[in-house]
């Protein structure tokens, strides 16, 4: 078992007791909720006449179902409006902080908590959403949970969890131009597999991560779950502290200095013991594109769709399914694949730095004929900051639509959906069958910069060749 890692320290500090089942009852420092997985949890509390134990430790926003175009109330979708009203009622009744549409703080839950300074090193974080691992970028231990567990946290502020093993993933060296954090995590998942992290927490380390911004670290940690890991984290450092300083919920004054000293003490020890260690060279990572129906089916943009002979036997069945669904042939070059829709946004790549980098490539170009392209900021704050920098004008002049914040086309729970057999270039995190709203729609995952390259050429294109 691991010893001396940040994961072990944070786990031990939050252990209430070891249960007869062998699981640990873990105290949850920050609970994030949204409109999709919380209504049933609140209903279960009412059925049992239970109260929210620590409402000040729960924070809510609306993101999954919110339209990114017409946000007038009531929403056009009756189900979306009902979910919205339920969240408004539950947060008001239980005195829970709620970042509603128009508040200036609304957005995707995994974008707003960091930007408000709510997520901090050494915390345990839970949310009824798969990509809660995002918050591990701060040196927190963050878990995506189901609705019944949302109920448990509301009622007791604890979760019953089995302790994970810890795998250290080191990436060293400088990333090539045109290669981003999204490519790093897609490369890791490609190499370790979508089930490679089952039973593990991933500790991301090495010089590549040391040089990453907080928003880049969030992109990597966000997709830990796509590699099977329950959570992923980066040890806190000066980059973390510079990001957090002066944010609304960050410690202030003398408390700030004390917080840094404590956060530093949580870092994994130099002689920490890990259950597994894997290393990668940043120079080996290229702009990466998924070709199949899992995030692990990725290749460098200059590669071809792999043939069955190139795969392990246990990968061949899902590959055969992917060839058929994606309408791609083994050995076919991924470059040149026609694209219908381009989406920049999501909790993976909807932050300000993502939009800044994408805008660099969009400037001076125009979306290709027949391509629908749109940009969805991850939060109202991101949208405001981007507009202050003129990024919205760069995108609209290039033929992109500029939308309101929300989860948008990452998932099919709002009006932003693929139609029929369309194929999308998407900066989101999942390329499952039907994920973007059409039973036959197809998704290629890539970085925001690569999405721009696809948008302006109408096909999968190596962003490094874009003038």
From Swiss-Prot:
Cofactor section: [4Fe-4S] cluster
Positions of [4Fe-4S] cluster binding: 347, 407, 410
Molecular function per GO: 3-isopropylmalate dehydratase activity; 4 iron, 4 sulfur cluster binding; metal ion binding
Reaction it catalyzes: (2R,3S)-3-isopropylmalate = (2S)-2-isopropylmalate
CDD domains: IPMI
Cofactor remark from the record: Binds 1 [4Fe-4S] cluster per subunit.
Gene Ontology biological process terms in this record: L-leucine biosynthetic process
Keywords carried by this UniProt record: 4Fe-4S, Amino-acid biosynthesis, Branched-chain amino acid biosynthesis, Iron, Iron-sulfur, Leucine biosynthesis, Lyase, Metal-binding
Domain of life: Bacteria
Keyword Lyase: yes
Keyword Lyase appears in the UniProt entry: yes
UniProt-listed Enzyme Commission number(s): 4.2.1.33
Enzyme class label: lyase
This protein's pathway: Amino-acid biosynthesis; L-leucine biosynthesis; L-leucine from 3-methyl-2-oxobutanoate: step 2/4
Similarity annotation: Belongs to the aconitase/IPM isomerase family. LeuC type 1 subfamily.
General function of this protein: Catalyzes the isomerization between 2-isopropylmalate and 3-isopropylmalate, via the formation of 2-isopropylmaleate.
Matches recorded under HAMAP family: LeuC_type1
Oligomeric form and interacting partners: Heterodimer of LeuC and LeuD.
Protein name as it appears in the record: 3-isopropylmalate dehydratase large subunit
Lineage: Bacteria, Bacillati, Cyanobacteriota, Cyanophyceae, Oscillatoriophycideae
Gene: leuC
